A protein has these predicted regions:
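Conserved nucleotide-sensing/catalytic segment adjacent to the nucleotide-binding pocket
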Residues: 1
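Conserved catalytic-core segment of NTP-binding enzymes
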Residues: 4-119, 132
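C-terminal accessory extensions appended to soluble enzyme cores
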Residues: 118-141
Length: 141
């Protein structure tokens, strides 16, 4: 789940359905972008996660470090996000299951030798969202 407690409330409606699943079969991911003000520190991230858990009535089972600034992202974003998510993971006991990023940035970040325990599975992604019309008309999708 991502977003905030208000957005997580919609998941709470499905609690009975989730409770009917075999124990351990539901994975609830907290997709984290530490460049967003509400998740920029370990304290803020844990507070946000606890609010989402309360409103969704589900426990987060893993973090996804998705720290980015869209097309302006660089390896520093992944590195900074790693530090925040690592500390939040250590404090909360919630494991880091994935780290996402553009392939070039992810490769650079992984080459730095960070603790794999707080990276999880690397997941290369492409950015398709355009922040402005000019970029879209110049570059297309």
């Amino acid at each position: 789940m991502g977003g905030d407690p208000a957005g997580a409330t919609a998941l709470g409606r499905y609690r009975e359905d989730f409770d009917a699943l075999p124990e351990g079969s539901l994975t609830v991911l907290n997709v984290v972008n530490t460049r967003r003000p509400m998740a920029g520190t370990p304290e803020k991230l844990i507070h946000l996660m606890e609010g989402m858990e309360r409103h969704s009535r589900q426990k987060v089972t893993g973090f996804v470090n998705n720290t980015n600034l869209a097309r302006m992202a660089n390896a520093d974003d992944l590195r900074d996000g790693y530090e925040v998510v690592r500390e939040a993971s250590e404090r909360s006991g919630v494991p880091v299951l994935y780290t996402t990023g553009r392939p070039d940035l992810l490769e650079q970040f992984l080459a730095e030798g960070h603790d794999p325990k707080f990276i999880g599975a690397p997941m290369p992604i492409q950015t398709y969202m355009h922040r402005d019309w000019e970029t879209f008309t110049r570059e297309g999708l």
